[in-house]
Amino acid sequence: SMVCIYTVAESWLNDRSSNKNRGSVLSVYMVILYGAMGVGMFLLNFSSPQNFQPFILVSVITSAALIPILLTKKKPPTFKRIKAMTLKDLYEASPFGMVSSFFYGTIQAALFTLLAVYATSMNFTIFEISVVTFLLAVSGAVSQFPVGKISDMYDRRLVIVISTFGAAIFALIAILVSRQMYLPEGLATSKTWFYIFLILFSFCSLPMFSLILAHTNDYIPKEKFVAAGAGLQFVFGLGAMSGPFLCSIFMDMVGSNGFFLFLFFFHTIIGVFGIYRMKVRQTVDNPDSQFVAMPQTITPAGIELNPQTEPIQEPVSISEPIESVAEPDNENKN
C-alpha cells in the first residue's frame, strides 16, 4: 500500500513538473520526505508504543495526506509504460551498481527497522529514540548535496568506496561508545558522543543509493535512465527483504552491538567490491549523467523527475496552432 501511495504522489509531481524545475521539485520532495521521516518518530512520545493509539494516528495522518490529491479538480496524470531492463542487461551495464544496490537494500532495511530495537536494548528512552531517528534522517538529507557534488568531480566508485568505509568505521566507533552505556551513571559516557557518530555514519551511508544510481547512469544511454532506476529499485527491494532477518541473526549471536557489527560488515562488502571493480574497469565520462539526490524509496514515476532523464513533452498551448493557421489566410488576402 505504501508503494502505491509513493507511486501516486510521485506521478502527480512528475506530471506537474516542467523541464526547467524537475531538479528543484525532486530536491524539495527529498528534503520533505526525510524531514517527515525524522519528525514522525516524535509522535511516539504522545502515547505508549504498546497501545493502539499510535497506529490510529498514523492511519489518520496517511489518509489526510491524500486529501489534496482527492479534492483537486485537475486531470490526473497518465501512466506511460516503461520499457524495463532485464537484470542481465543491468548487470552487464554496471555490475557494481547492481551488486551494491542489493547490499545497500539489505543495509537500509535493517537500519530503519532495527535501529529503534537497538536503542531500546541500550536503555534509551522513547524521546531519545525519537532523537536518534530524527538525527539519522536529517543528516542523510543534508549529506546528499555535498557528497553528490564531490561525486560529479571524481570517480563515483571512489566516492562510494570512501563513503562505505567511512560508514563502516563510524559503525565500529558507535559500538565502542555504546558499550560505555552499561557502566554506572557516574562513569557512563554521555550519549551525545553516540549521537555525533550516528550523524557521521548517516552522512556517509544515506547518500549511497543516489550515488549508485548516478554511477549506473554513467554506463548507459540517457533514454534508459528511468528503466535502469526501476531495475536498481527492484534489486534494492530484494536486498531489503533479507536485511532485518540477517541483522537479527547478528544481534542474536553477539548481542545488541551486533546491529552495528552488521552495518560494518555489509558496508565493507560494498567497499571491497568497489575497489575490485575499479581495477577491472575504467571509469567513463558521460555528460548526460550527473548526481541527483534521490531517496531510496523513489518509484519509477519519481525517477522521471531526474532532470538528466529524457525531457518531458510539455503540452503546446491552444493559441499557437490558431495563430499558425491564421497567418496564411492574412497573406492570401494581401
Spell out what each predicted region is.
Residues 4-17, 206-220:
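Intracellular juxtamembrane helix-capping segments at the cytosolic ends
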Residues 19-29, 126-127, 220-232:
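Loop-to-transmembrane helix entry/capping segments in MFS-fold secondary transporters
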Residues 44-45, 59-79, 270-278:
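C-terminal membrane-cytosol helix-exit motif in multi-pass small-molecule transporters
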Residues 46-61, 249-267:
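A membrane-interface helix-boundary motif in multi-pass transporters
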Residues 48, 143-155, 251-252:
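Helix-to-loop junctions at the C-terminal end of transmembrane segments
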Residues 59, 158-173, 264:
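Structural signature of the two symmetry-related core transmembrane helices
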Residues 79-84, 277-334:
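Intrinsic disorder in cytosolic terminal tails and internal cytosolic loops
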Residues 166-186:
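C-terminal ends and interior cores of transmembrane alpha-helices
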